[in-house]
């Protein structure tokens, strides 16, 4: 049997998809502004 692919880990999640990471690059900031424009409750993980 192969293991499940999703092994939840909050620290890994934040480091890969977190707000600080999004703010780091221009593209990431574009993602955040798009999500703000759409009216998302959560901007990032």
UniProtKB/Swiss-Prot annotation:
One of its GO terms (molecular function) is structural constituent of ribosome. Coiled coil: none annotated. Keywords: Ribonucleoprotein, Ribosomal protein. Pfam families: Ribosomal_L34. Gene3D superfamilies: 1.10.287.3980. InterPro entries: Ribosomal_bL34, Ribosomal_bL34_CS. GO terms for biological process: translation. Belongs to the bacterial ribosomal protein bL34 family. This is Large ribosomal subunit protein bL34. The gene is rpmH.
């Amino acid at each position: 049997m192969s293991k499940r692919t999703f092994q939840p880990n909050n620290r890994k999640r934040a480091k890969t998809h977190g707000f600080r990471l999004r703010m780091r690059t221009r593209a990431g900031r574009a993602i955040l502004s798009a999500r703000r424009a759409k009216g998302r409750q959560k901007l990032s993980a």
